[in-house]
């Protein structure tokens, strides 16, 4: 089992200026800092005794057989990226703050999941690569 945690963040100004529709025309800037509240991701291989291949627990629970049936977009895309089409995997998300808090929870969850899932593959990525992959997934794949 792999457990990772990623901090939430507070943006002081510039919200929305990190979207391509804005910064390609107007430039963008965000000043942000992490806080001492975290998102946690646990990832483990499931024994092959279940009728599903993927169990995902966040504010919903998913039990699905095929990766393309996963409703949680970032987790689906991360599993595809690391080629987890044949393994039985469980991803469990928990956090110190509720969803929709406005403190970057979805980005924290994506970054944390990339870190944990890459570690399961023994393909640890540096912080810059994790950040670029998270941006690609959130802005281009979804």
Where in the sequence are the language-model features?
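Active-site signature of alpha/beta-hydrolase-fold catalytic machinery across serine-
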Residues: 112
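Alpha/beta catalytic cores of group-transfer enzymes, especially the acyltransferase/condensing modules
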Residues: 127-142
């Amino acid at each position: 089992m792999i457990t990772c945690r990623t901090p939430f963040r507070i943006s002081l100004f510039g919200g929305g200026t990190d979207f391509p529709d804005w910064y390609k025309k107007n430039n963008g800037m965000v000043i942000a800092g992490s806080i001492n509240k975290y998102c946690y991701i646990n990832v483990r291989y499931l024994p092959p005794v279940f009728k599903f291949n993927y169990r995902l627990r966040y504010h919903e629970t998913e039990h699905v057989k095929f990766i393309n049936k996963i409703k949680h977009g970032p987790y689906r895309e991360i599993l595809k990226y690391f080629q987890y089409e044949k393994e039985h995997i469980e991803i469990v998300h928990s956090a110190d703050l509720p969803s929709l808090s406005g403190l970057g929870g979805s980005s924290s969850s994506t970054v944390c999941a990339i870190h944990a899932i890459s570690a399961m593959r023994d393909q640890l990525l540096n912080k810059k690569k994790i950040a670029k992959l998270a941006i690609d997934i959130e802005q281009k794949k979804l």
